[in-house]
């Protein structure tokens, strides 16, 4: 089946969640009934919003409702894995809705693939990024006291169909992370491409690079199956 790229640009979180849920349900149903379907890779940005995953702890949000309103942010409890994270303008969010069985991927391998795609995007800007043991996502200097996260990852999978995905800080206002314990960590920082490069990075350029790396990695999986 084919995989198509969809760009929603700036979209409210609630609308994006509803639309990806509908597409997710459609793919699950089509797969179960043996019907044709499309894999989709959605890219977008959101207005200021915090999302708390199934395993998240309420005390990792440091603001009350009135304080959230004051910074023009909202909070959603959602059905992905992971703890609390922030989405906002200048952050590239990617929601792949994929049939993992088509690529012979398990959930752990899939998360590893998402991390690898972001690591390669960072490398294309001269930034050395990697993984941190027992901590999903992409990190800089992960094994040092200066460890800082540049990309959060949280997914949901049912019948080997995925939704939710990754959030890569490009030109993100990092002050919004100070209102939470990002992903439940209290001793690690966050960063962005702009923070590391000391200049704005064109969002369309980053989208193109991420699309390229995801496509390359998924195609490699398909080629391995064919061999």
Curated annotation (Swiss-Prot):
CDD domains: LipB (cd16444). Its EC number is 2.3.1.181. The active site is at 183 (acyl-thioester intermediate). Keywords: Acyltransferase, Cytoplasm, Transferase. Its main location: cytoplasm. GO terms for molecular function: lipoyl(octanoyl) transferase activity. GO terms for biological process: protein modification process. It catalyses: octanoyl-[ACP] + L-lysyl-[protein] = N(6)-octanoyl-L-lysyl-[protein] + holo-[ACP] + H(+). The keyword Acyltransferase applies. It is found in: Cytoplasm. Substrate binds at residues 80-87, 152-154, 165-167. Pathway: Protein modification; protein lipoylation via endogenous pathway; protein N(6)-(lipoyl)lysine from octanoyl-[acyl-carrier-protein]: step 1/2. Catalyzes the transfer of endogenously produced octanoic acid from octanoyl-acyl-carrier-protein onto the lipoyl domains of lipoate-dependent enzymes. Lipoyl-ACP can also act as a substrate although octanoyl-ACP is likely to be the physiological substrate. PANTHER family: OCTANOYLTRANSFERASE. This is Octanoyltransferase. It comes from Bacteroides thetaiotaomicron (strain ATCC 29148 / DSM 2079 / JCM 5827 / CCUG 10774 / NCTC 10582 / VPI-5482 / E50). The lineage of its organism: Bacteria, Pseudomonadati, Bacteroidota, Bacteroidia, Bacteroidales.
